[in-house]
From Swiss-Prot:
GO terms for cellular component: periplasmic space. Keywords: Cell cycle, Cell division, Periplasm, Signal. The keyword Disulfide bond does not apply. It comes from Brucella melitensis biotype 1 (strain ATCC 23456 / CCUG 17765 / NCTC 10094 / 16M). Pfam families: PD40 (PF07676), TolB_N (PF04052). It comes from the Bacteria. Part of the Tol-Pal system, which plays a role in outer membrane invagination during cell division and is important for maintaining outer membrane integrity. GO terms for biological process: cell division; protein import. This is Tol-Pal system protein TolB. The Tol-Pal system is composed of five core proteins: the inner membrane proteins TolA, TolQ and TolR, the periplasmic protein TolB and the outer membrane protein Pal. They form a network linking the inner and outer membranes and the peptidoglycan layer.
Amino acid sequence: MKIGIINTKIRTVFSAFACMIAASLVCTMPARAVVEININKGVIEPLPIAITDFLSADQLGSNITSVIAADLERSGLFAPIDTGAFIEKISNPDAAPRFEDWKVINAQALVTGRITKQPDGRLKAEFRLWDTFGGQQMIGQQFFTTPDNWRRVAHIIADAIYERLTGDKGYFDTRVVFVDESGPAQKRVKRLAIMDQDGANVRFISDGRALSLTPRFSPNRQEVTYMSFEGGSPKVYLLQLETGQRELVGNFPGMTIAPRFSPDGQKVVMSLLQDDGSANIYTMDLRNRTTTRLTSSQAIDTGASYSPDGSQIVFTSDRGGRPQLYVMGADGSNPRRISMGDGSYSTPVWSPRGDLIAFTKQSQGQFSIGVMKTDGSGERLLTSGFHNEGPTWAPNGRVLMFFRKAAGAGGPKLFTIDLTGRNERQIQTPNFASDPAWSPLLE
């Protein structure tokens, strides 16, 4: 089956992730900027930031500004100031602003920029980030792209601002693969879809004729592995996003579920359901198609997720009576239980930073999204309700996306939440949505 929908070779659109910093934009970086956000302090007050409309010959500059502001505001770390409060109107984004005018409205940082169309039809996007109270430019960069990729420029600029002010990589220039759900509950159509992390640019990558679940990105963002009921029983497939070509991952005699890539993209880990009702974890080496069995139990072992360095795997098992989280070596050695709380645990996923494991917990009639340290200590529940499930990490390990279904009629919706549990946002999608998986940063 070929689905020629998505061209993922976006990296060729940009000139060196920015033709990074032309001579006219180079600035001396101070050893320590006056304005910064310490995101390791826990709950913090959002930083007031003024983002002026990028100068352009049409509406595009304003559109780019809106996306940048929305990205930063949604992170919970920034509070974009209403443009109606601006005193100075920026007419030359290359010139130093009147810092006093921005200090009056308590703008801790200021963003100015310009969009121009080049003779070859490309867009040139320039921006500068200013420390208003320090009275200095913090960064200045320029990017070239085709007009249809203007949203990517906005996300990349937002990432640059986020990184300069927090010291952490941003996560805005990313995508999410998920399950789109449409139609009545009794005849729900579930299709695989891909979108920008903010819900824009949704594209379908399966036709919905067969139930498809648990899509997961490869580390290079070019492939998705997922489970499909085509043929009647669940099997794991590999889909090439650029060509739409797909293939069966291992022609196992039983049902295969819950696939996920290894960090180097060379293996897929999954669970194989046995005739006796048990499930064990296997890996398939995508280079030579050899399979390795990692667990051998009479329990249900599933939901495997690698540590960022590929040395360990966290998974769910009911070998102790109810589903709990276990960690083992990537070769299946030394399995040990790490979850010790009441209730049942599932859908574990290791943080890209390596410090935490996110999970779904069912206890006292509620489903919660939580995190714990990799040894099981420090468990924290970030959000609880009727049904919350399926966390996935932003590539910087600071934000989670999950799906929620409210009691009663309706269907699941996607939400993000940060590690404080205080900044929860819904991601708008065309239909109901579930099973999200975040991509690495695009290139």
